[in-house]
Amino acid sequence: MFRRKLQALDYHNPAGFNFKDETEFRNFLVWLEDQKIRHYKIEERGNLRNIHSSEWPAQYEKYLNDVNCPFKVQERQESIDWLLGLAVRLEYGDNAAKYQNAKPYNSDVSKSAEPLINLDVNNPDFKAGVMALANLLQIQRHDDYLMMLKAIRILVQERLSQEAVAKSNSAKEGLPVALDKHILGFDTGDAVLNDAARILRLLHIEELRELQTKINEAIVAVQAIIADPKTDHRLGKVGR
């Protein structure tokens, strides 16, 4: 109910404030007058601070009148809201220059296309998370956790994205192959065995092509990391 205004005033427990609790309410009012409103001089706040006095309700009523609150003692919820509004206005007035010169949060932070640039690579939670992902995806460990994360990102983009999964799940329609047009290079003496040998050779060629594709993808991924200007090339050597 009052959480936002209490937060604006740096109240110690904005979410848990219970205005129906008499002791908490009285302590809150003392804090509000001492720290924010400051309508009374310090020496005039004694009666308001004496929260255990039987005269405190009368003092509270006097306080509402002194600050020109339009609500009565019985209208506690409304009077609290009004007092908080007064405190916020006074707080802003005391610190107007500070608030006017304040810049929106993250206004000076450029939105980089590189999402990894603002990560704290020394954070233990970050390291533990990267290591867990690397183990899950069977990625080679590296002393540079940021480089490991980049490798994870490349793998996810290439293999686990929605497009990659859809592509892998789609049926591959093969073309009919005329086995007799593929020269085997030897003769087993059996036509059936010759056809089986041709099929095995074609399957082996297909596996080699897939392996070459994976090698090319790995080379591209490594080149992307090496081309990063933030990569520390002192970690490796070229030549002797």
UniProtKB/Swiss-Prot annotation:
GO MF assignments: RNA binding; RNA polymerase II complex binding
Alphabetically ordered keywords of this record: Cytoplasm, Cytoskeleton, Nucleus, RNA-binding, Transcription, Transcription regulation
Protein purpose: RNA-binding protein involved in modulation of mRNA transcription by Polymerase II. Component of the tRNA-splicing ligase complex.
Superkingdom as given in the UniProt entry: Eukaryota
Quaternary state and interactors: Homodimer. Component of a tRNA-splicing ligase complex.
Family: Belongs to the RTRAF family.
InterPro entries in UniProt: RTRAF
Main location: nucleus
Cellular component, GO annotation: centrosome; cytoplasm; cytosol; mitotic spindle; nucleus; perinuclear region of cytoplasm; tRNA-splicing ligase complex
Matching PANTHER family: CLE (PTHR15924)
Pfam families, sorted: RLL
Subcellular location: Nucleus; Cytoplasm, Cytosol; Cytoplasm, Perinuclear region; Cytoplasm, Cytoskeleton, Microtubule organizing center, Centrosome
Protein name (database record): RNA transcription, translation and transport factor protein
Organism: Xenopus laevis (African clawed frog)
One BP annotation, GO: tRNA splicing, via endonucleolytic cleavage and ligation
